[in-house]
A protein has these predicted regions:
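An anion/pyrophosphate-binding glycine-rich loop and adjacent beta-alpha core
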Residues: 293, 302-410
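Glycine-rich active-site loop/strand segments that organize a redox cofactor
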Residues: 51-91
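Conserved redox-cofactor binding core of oxidoreductases
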Residues: 92-246, 267-268, 415, 419-442
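N-terminal Rossmann-like FAD-binding beta1-loop-alpha1 element of flavoenzymes
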Residues: 8-33
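C-terminal structured subdomain/cap of oxidoreductase catalytic cores
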Residues: 22, 32, 248-249, 374, ...
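A glycine-rich dinucleotide-binding beta-alpha-beta segment and adjacent secondary-structure elements
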Residues: 410-493, 497
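Glycine-rich FAD pyrophosphate-binding loop
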Residues: 26-47
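Glycine-rich loop(s) and the adjacent beta-strand/alpha-helix scaffold that form part
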Residues: 204-314, 510-513
């Protein structure tokens, strides 16, 4: 078996892995980054939104008054006790510096504030309310502020985020070994992690590597939207890896950082830990198979929050849809419609088996048709058209309920309650509508496999880490020497509750933490050793 040596070996080249590599290299370590495919991971297929606040330059440019305390008090409601108060406070206090650090590494942001509530803004806007900050029950506890900092680029800008981070990695001379899958950690007799065994295609024929690269790219996108296509392409990827992969032993003199993503692409793990979440769209790549978590567990690492999955049932854009009522088959309200999509999805799955209908009247439908184009990305526009085509329409509340299979009396009661004063779910008054203009429509927004109206899902749990260093903790709570984890391979800021941008922000936060501390661990590479 051939071998290589580095100070720090990083498994995974998404946002967490890239940030870990940059920090480790800046601390003086010789770094080797591995990626099963060609880098980017789930970060590259994301929207490129980074959650930040406390007075960033972009917020100031937009005239937004925000503070570290306001950000902290809001996130405390979302995060709960998944991380300590000290860690969350440190995350919030370092938020403005995080954006500056990303900008220093070539990632562009802009303070163009989105004037309407949306799940993801159009290319005119790059700062927006990306969570439930202004929703009922939150706005009174913490001063709301837009904190979704979208990377400035067309469409879903995660690809630009990763392009710039990858460039920053390579500018530092950090070595990246693509098309290399980590298989097992190397652990010495005292439990210290000293390296990783991989299977690499680096010596495979060029045509084979090109085919593998192309298949993996198509499996990531558009395969993300067509699971059967992804499955077929991934089988071909695995055949290439089995035939041409060569085993390689890589020693890490200071540490290994697991930044290999979550496990949303591993349907068996999803079935085991979160069986109610099997009807969504796996947001990520085929490499989000839990392999990083598995390797950490095999080395003695503990896990937590594996049952936590973010399922985004967005009803915007356009923002006019927020005036509707989200109801169950009993006709009762499900949640404040202005809440973030993951909160909506969680409530629907936990309490209503993923089923729900959005009631709108003719006035809202007219606004939706008027605003859809100006408030939507192309893919959001397709979803709006799909929803309008699939809606059930009738002249009265009772008739539309019967046509949709919703209890008429329950629906009428919900509408009357929403008109009577303070909204029963706490929906802010600026989103409330009288719903008094027939005809009425009920739109099926149930969570199920549906290309026209998919429900993206992302796993949130992972390996338990030391919150000061990012070192993986054992079942006894002791840090495992030489082993670190970051991003969705680890428990982090967003592992209890997710809002847009919080996962990427945690990838930056935890990746930098793991990279910096792994670079300080143990000895360094002898310059005469076989360094990649």
């Amino acid at each position: 078996m051939d071998s290589l040596v580095a100070d720090v070996v990083i498994v995974g080249f998404g946002a967490a892995g890239a940030c870990a590599a940059i920090e480790a290299a800046d601390a003086g370590a010789r770094v080797l980054v591995l990626d099963r495919f060609s880098g980017g991971g789930a970060s590259a297929v994301s929207g490129g939104v980074v959650y930040a606040g406390g007075g960033t330059a972009q917020q100031r440019d937009a005239g937004v008054d925000d503070s570290v305390d306001a950000m902290y008090y809001y996130l405390r409601l979302e995060v709960g006790d998944v991380v300590s108060e000290e860690t969350l406070r440190r995350f919030c206090a370092g938020s403005t510096e995080m954006i500056s650090w990303l900008e220093g590494n070539g990632v562009p942001f802009e303070g163009s504030l989105c004037p309407y509530k949306t799940s993801y803004p159009s290319d005119k806007h790059y700062l927006y309310y990306s969570g439930s900050e202004a929703a009922g029950g939150f706005r009174d506890a913490a001063k709301p502020a837009p904190r979704g900092h979208r990377v400035k680029g067309p469409g879903t800008s995660g690809k630009l985020l990763m392009k710039r981070l990858a460039e920053a990695v390579r500018r530092r001379g950090i070595q990246v070994l693509p098309q290399t899958a980590a298989r097992n950690l190397i652990v010495d007799a005292d439990g210290t992690v000293t390296g990783v065994v991989v299977s690499t295609l680096r010596d495979a024929p060029a045509r084979v590597r090109a085919t593998h690269r192309k298949l993996a790219a198509y499996a990531a996108k558009p395969g993300i939207y067509v699971p059967s296509l992804r499955k077929s392409l991934h089988r071909r990827v695995e055949r290439i890896e089995r035939r041409y992969g060569r085993e390689l032993r890589i020693s890490a003199s200071r540490g290994v950082v697991l930044a290999a993503g979550g496990f949303i692409a591993n349907r068996e793990m999803v079935r085991e830990h979160a069986p109610a979440y099997r009807g969504g769209l796996a947001l990520g790549t085929s490499a989000d198979d839990g392999s990083g978590i598995r390797m950490g567990v095999e080395a003695g690492g503990a896990t937590a929050e594996l049952g936590r999955i973010s399922a985004w049932r967005f009803i915007t854009p356009p923002s006019a849809f927020l005036g509707g009522l989200l109801v169950s088959e009993t006709g009762g309200r499900i949640i404040d419609e202005s809440r973030y999509g993951a909160a909506v999805g969680e409530r629907m799955i936990a309490d209503h088996e993923g089923r729900g209908w959005l009631l709108v009247d003719d006035a809202i439908v007219r606004e939706v048709k008027r605003d859809a184009r100006g408030q939507s990305q192309w893919f959001q526009g397709l979803q709006v058209r799909y929803l309008l085509r699939q809606r059930v329409v009738a002249g009265s509340l009772e008739d539309v309920a019967r046509k949709a299979g919703v209890d008429p009396a329950g629906l009428v009661a919900s509408v009357e309650a929403s008109r009577s004063g303070a909204d029963p779910t706490g929906k802010p008054p600026e989103f409330a509508r009288p719903l008094d203009r027939a005809p009425y429509s009920l739109i099926d927004v149930s969570i199920k496999p549906n290309l026209g109206y998919p429900c993206p899902m992302l796993t949130l749990g992972g390996l338990v880490v030391d919150e000061e260093t990012g070192a993986v903790r054992s079942g006894a709570g002791v840090p495992i020497r030489g082993l670190y984890a970051a991003g969705r391979t680890a428990v982090g800021i967003c592992s209890r509750s997710y809002v847009s941008g919080l996962s990427l922000a945690d990838c930056v936060f935890s990746g930098r933490r793991a990279g910096a501390h792994s670079a300080l661990d143990r000895g360094s590479v002898d310059k005469n050793e076989n360094v990649f």
